[in-house]
């Protein structure tokens, strides 16, 4: 049970680093975090995913700008659900190789000393360091823990959210794309399950839009806000709306 608890804590921290920091804060500027919290999220992303903030932000912004077109980096409508669900990480690598897009869409991402000298040029050093730490602390089970951590974002974010989130589920809004909400209680993927709501109001720090929807990422933001560690910049109005309103 101890290892399962560690796995749950580590993987959920990674999910929160992606949804709160990379997505809601860096890509869409819906929320700002205290520098200590922001840097912790950036460090944890480097340690557990090897993803570079600027690249992630650029690819996601391009997804919104070119949604459901041939230029969308990961639309199941153009690439096929199987391709996005099972090869999401490969599509991400292909997208980050488009350096002109990274320049165009990645503006405003961190570019401080540690980003230029560690997080960007040595992105793969994070997971390697994590493998060493896991092995020292937990032995052979630590290697299994590391393997699951490495697969967590490629499966749940690149596969489930980017794939199923544009293919299956319910819609509150008739947005100009095929985005869907996978479940009203968004507890497992940091709130990213409410993908149609997000596409309707991309810059909103809160993804839940109806009284019976729950966004665990928003709960985390509110807790950090209560501690003076987060500042909400944009939030969509909470409306109990009828389904399929056009936006």
Where are these regions (language model features)?
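Non-catalytic, topology-defining segments of multipass membrane proteins
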Residues: 1-160, 164, 204-247
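Active-site-proximal inter-transmembrane loops
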Residues: 106-114, 168-194, 198-201
């Amino acid at each position: 049970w101890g290892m399962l608890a560690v796995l749950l804590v580590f993987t959920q921290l990674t999910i929160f680093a992606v949804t709160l920091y990379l997505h809601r804060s860096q890509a869409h500027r819906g929320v700002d975090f205290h520098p200590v919290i922001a840097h912790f999220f950036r460090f944890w992303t480097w340690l557990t995913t090897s993803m570079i903030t600027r690249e992630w932000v650029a690819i996601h912004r391009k997804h919104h700008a070119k949604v459901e077109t041939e230029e969308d980096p990961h639309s199941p409508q153009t690439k096929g659900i199987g391709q996005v669900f099972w090869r999401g990480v490969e599509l991400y690598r292909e997208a980050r190789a488009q350096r002109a897009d990274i320049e165009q869409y990645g503006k405003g991402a961190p570019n401080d000393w540690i980003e230029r000298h560690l997080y960007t040029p040595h992105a793969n050093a994070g997971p390697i360091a994590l493998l060493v730490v896991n092995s020292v602390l937990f032995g052979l089970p630590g290697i299994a823990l590391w393997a699951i951590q490495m697969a967590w974002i490629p499966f749940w974010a690149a596969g489930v959210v980017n794939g199923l989130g544009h293919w299956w589920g319910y819609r509150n809004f008739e947005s100009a794309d095929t985005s869907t909400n996978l479940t009203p209680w968004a507890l497992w993927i940091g709130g990213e399950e409410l993908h149609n709501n997000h596409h309707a109001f991309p810059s909103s720090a809160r993804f839940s839009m109806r009284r019976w929807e729950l966004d665990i990422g928003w709960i985390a933001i509110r807790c950090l806000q209560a501690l003076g560690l987060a500042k909400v910049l944009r939030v969509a109005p909470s409306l109990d709306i009828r389904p399929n309103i056009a936006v």
